[in-house]
From Swiss-Prot:
Residues 988-1127, 1168-1358 form the RNase III domain. A motif (DEAH box) lies at residues 193-196. Residues 1-61 are annotated as: Disordered. CDD domains: DEXHc_dicer (cd18034), RIBOc (cd00593). GO terms for cellular component: cytoplasm; nucleus. The gene is DCL2. Residues 1-11 have a biased composition (Low complexity). This is Dicer-like protein 2. Coiled coil: none annotated. Its cofactor is Mg(2+); Mn(2+). Residues 609-712 form the Dicer dsRNA-binding fold domain. Pfam families: DEAD, Dicer_dimer, Helicase_C, Ribonuclease_3. Residues 415-579 form the Helicase C-terminal domain. The keyword Metal-binding applies.
Amino acid sequence: MSSQDESASSSDTGEGGHVFGRENLNQSADYGYKTGSSASTHSTTDDAISEEPQPSGNGPRSIIARAYQLEMFQASMQQNIIVSMDTGSGKTQVAVLRIRAELERTPPEKRVWFLAPTVALCAQQYEVIRSQIKVANSIVMTGDDNVDSWSDVQTWDAVLANVRVVVCTYMILFEALSHAFVTMDSISLLVMDEAHNCTGKFPGRLIMKRFYMPRKSAGDHVPHILGLTASPVMKSDLSSMEDLESSLDSVCRGPTLQREELFANVHQPTMTVTTYKECDLRSPVQYTRNMNNLHLAFENLDIAEDPYVLHLMGQRTPKSLRELDRILTKLDTYTQNQMKALQRKSSSLFRELGQWAVDSYIYNVVEKVSNLDARSSWLGGWLDDEQRYLHRAIQGINALPVSAAIPAPEMTSIKLQVLLRILRGYEGSPVGIVFVKERATAGILSQLLAIIPDINARYKVGCMVGTSRYMSRKMNIHEVLQQGDDLLALEKFRSGAINLLVATSVLEEGIDVPVCNLVICFDMPANLKSFIQRRGRARMRESKLHLMIEEDSLVSVKDWGALEAAMKQRYENDMRELDHLAQVEEEDEMDVPPLHSRTTAAKVTVDDAKGHLEHFCRVVTRSQQYVDASPEYLVTTKTTAFVGGKPIPILGVTVLLPASLPPNLRQAHSSRDWISERNAKKDAALQAYKMLYEAGLINEHLLPIRESDFVDREVDGRPGLLEVQEQWNPWPCIVEAWETGLSSQTIHRRRLQLTDQDGMLMGELDALLPVPFPPISILKLYWIQHSEHPWTISFDPDVTMSGPGSTDPSFEIQQALDQTQILLDMAFGHRFSVSEQSKALRFIWPNRTLKLQMIGGQPFSKKAGEAHSSDYIIRSYGRDPYIYKSWVPVKPPLELVRGYWKAKPDEEEPPADAPWVVVKRLPKNCGFVKNSRIPIELPKEYQTSSPRRFDYIIPEQLCTFDTVPATLVQLGMLVPSITQAMEPYFVAQELLRRTALGSLDFKDIDLVMMVITSSSAGRLTNYERVEFLGDAVLKLGAAVTCATNNLHFPEGYLSLLKDRLVSNSRLCKAATALGLDQFIITRQYSLKQWRNMLTAPEPPTNTRKMSSKTLADVTEALIGAAYIEGGMSKALRCISLMIPNERWRSLDESRAVLYQVALNDIPLPSTLGPLEELLGYSFNKKSLLIEAITHASYNIPGSAGSSLERLEFLGDSVLDFVVVARLFSVKDPAPIEHYNMHLLRTAVVNGEFLGFLAMEWRTAATQRSVVVRTGQGTADELETVETPGLPLFGFLRHNASGDWVRDQQLAEERHAEMAPGIRDALEHGQRYPWDLLARLRISKVHSDVLEAVIGAVWVDSGSLEECEKLIERVGILRYLDRALRDGVKILHPKEELGRVAQNNKVVYKVDKAKRAARAEVYEVSGELAEGEDVEFLCSVTVGDRCVARVGGAVSKNDAMTKAALEVIRVWEEAGRSWDNVGVVLEEGV
């Protein structure tokens, strides 16, 4: 078992520790590490991941750990080590990797303690850890928290409850261990920052000596140790490193391999030593005016008046008298010491900076103290009288302000003038630090530099002197001016607002500052460690390090020159080593066979392989944020050989590919061992490329697979309109059946009953067909298009009236033909001949015989009209039909008549005094399946209130009437609609009979008829709703099939495959290949079409134009119909018929394959236990959950499994299907219309909404205790505070830094600010918050995590129901139900504006401008660079009017959305009218 395995085993037993230390040094350490390209993106801060800033760009930058960091991480997993790397090389990132690994492998009761020597460093490292490790609670404890007052174990237990990582100073842990508030067995890892301090009696060394070593000697558990330092040697004596190793039970380790990359990334500064002559200040004669006044005030102090002396004299005890004697001899009182310290500081400032500086300092101190209350808490005397006495002494200094606002050269020191020359002489854009020894010097020097004109023109100066351990510490008089905010200055330096920082040694160690190109040591470094730390701050290319040395210093220029010469010697040695490596590379013969394509002449050689492999990695990761695309190389030393008498390591290389690839394709090895590291990498790259080619990820041109490789040339690129077969017409076949073989035909009859809207029977007819009737039972028709209520035609069951063996069926058949012709002639004979139309669908009047003479066969008379009890038909000249209403004796006045019969020119006008008949005209078109939803206003004379109360009048002498009820004629007029209603059924039946779809055995012919009916047909139902369902079913089936059939394909390739399978072009081809095109119903009902229904088009006119989308939609609708009837299994059978060239698998089979390949026996890290509780689902294979929350940047060597992309690919389709199925299932109060289903689905599956939920959905809040300071002299109290739970996104495992951390911090800040408003809108609002979600600017990574978890649950459970429960819990379905219940407006504001604008053109104009006095904007585009203070403005024109202009937007999309909402608001306030809508300007725009 390896050391890692041993450690993991111990964690399983709850120990979580180790027993190895320095003695493991001689064990085999044959582990590799990975390296990225030397062109990788770099960080701009100390202890980040790398050194150099990446040029700004539009996309997110990606940063991963460099090879040497990963080498150190792996070494720390093997044994205790002290990581020794230069300042800024990324030691903290090594610690983050190590902490994360420790948390995952140890139980929750174990903690990691990160120790740092200073408060500022604790705060900085805590922020780094907190931002990168969110799965565990972490806290920071410093002296500022008054930890020394936590005097019982209950307080400590309460504070540390539920905490996994503690960041604190060394002293805090030492004291906690000393008092048994914390025990060693609760610590799994100790990280010791600035570990070089752990010598002598430093608390870090005492922790090891008193608590660690005894336990180790006894064989008890001890924590792992990880030290971090840039300078393990404090002095020139190398034995101090051995002492440090012994103290920390560790070995000092620095990167030993990858020399080529290390050299390429090390940027040492050019060092310059500058000497100066120090001012000789030996007597008061040389004092400045204010120094003399200070000296005089001090000399005038009478020790006998000192309050402390008077206090001792008043006690008159032996002890007080002895103390009084000592005080009088040494002048050692509080006031005397404060005045002496002020004099010393003044003298020091005079020597360092000159006359102007010291006079300004003394004057400002006096002014500051004089303005304080005599009993200010800043004055730290023992007695109140002492404070007042000191206050009076300071006020007695006759300090005068400086005479000049800007110091003249003669008023400054030679040393300051040297500094000014250095600053003035620097060329380029400076980013620098001036290191000084004393705090007072730092403050005054920064003020001086800030007022000197030519200096402040180039340098924005700040000051940092360090943060005190105790906030309540009393300040000395000489420190009262040092009240600047160190952290604020540091933040400004990091942000670029300050480019020159004057700092004390506090900035030498650890503090995260930008890389500099100018470092000036105003005072000589105290030791070698200090020199190395300061030098490490100058890490930009061509940076400068200036050492200012006093001529008479004990350390001579010669000594520093020797140091500089030694450094140059080191550079030269490094260059010689590079030359040697190049020579070795040339001698290392490259005899690796190239990669040849099997079908083309393409070839990749070993020299080409690295470039090709890098290109492949960029292609497969191009859609992934925060991911370094470079392949990473693990270099291992196999043995050692001697070349030219020099020992040379024999190397092997393993190349690691992105985590988005499956584990079996994540690494490849060099084919043999190599002397040259570069050649070994080339070999490994070629072997990896060969592996990818064999796996099918490289095409035959030896390039990464692209979209064009998936294109079916016969499918893709089809035009929008296609020429397809004419819609199949069933009626010619039916007529043929009537005309042939009647003796062998079975004649089918169904009785039709017409009832009005009240259910009253209006008439009956028997319909006959030589084929079975379609399964239609009820047909609802509107008499005219604007009828409010429909009439109902009900169909009795199909019965047989004749058939084989009948004696004389021809009589009834002929009778039906005759009666049908008469019936149709009654309805339409006055307009056209109906002889042909009567041959298809035939009718018989039950129990009656229709005769031609019944049509207008009787002349009209008043008596005849009154004899009929119901409506009947009146005809003029025996042809045009009307419904009889009444009789009038004379022609009514024309103003009372809506219409009347007019004689033709050759006809005689009937007399006005003759009788006239009042009738109602029959409509030209009737029998509509849908009524008009928009009421049409009738002409004035047809309105009910119109005085024209007579509809139409005809002279009585021209009228005849039918001897059949008017309802029979109306039934005849409905025959075309009845025929049209039957036609789709026949088409659907023929579809199933003639195509392979018949094998699916559809039971519901109504469903099939619906899904082949286009909306253009204008029928009551069409395919759109079912197509919406079928689309989701197809995409789910395609996603699952692609993932199962291509287990080694990354998500990008899977998306290309799926898109090819479900593309409209592919579905069009499937439809035409199946012969589906001629069965798609697109013809809209019309009387003209009914008249021509028996006319078959002749070639070449037997085709029609159809959009490719219609063909694709019907294909998906049939898939949806199959799902409705038989679930996913029948749907997949349907899909396999449509697209037969793919191996379609059932969901169960696919899930079984995917589950099988998921890694077994992977324990769930303890940090992820709360995640399972949040999800409400316990995984059978924990590896699936781990994969679902692993970002592609998680490039830790040895990490099992892949990243989340493939699961996210599956989860996206599962989520889409679950949402669509829920929408389709809604029936109350009515099914949701197709368009609204699209809107609702978009609302709940878009990335912004899902990302918001990934930040909202969180574990339960936890409670922990904090110590609350109640005030001086009062005991502190323990208060319980609630720590918010961790959101789903917070569990994401990643190894990104830099931009990732910044972007996520900004996202969290925006979420904290905007979440209440978004929650309110989602829970109570009547409009979907498109604008708020857009302004939140959540990255795609957030939604990817949620979808990946859904995919993982499906693969693990195989249950869509489990996924639906998860989707319900996260809040997606909950909001969907709420939006449906409350009628939330889902339409996007831009789309809504497009609708309400009607025929007016809407134009958006977006501009960008700098914004004044506001927080920084981080997301910008276009010509304004990232980080500039900009806002987006948008003006909207509707028609020819500028309606609104808004500003303050954070992106172009936000601006347009915001503007659209404003325009809608203005329009609504204007009464929903565009008339007189003025320009509305937002305030400040």
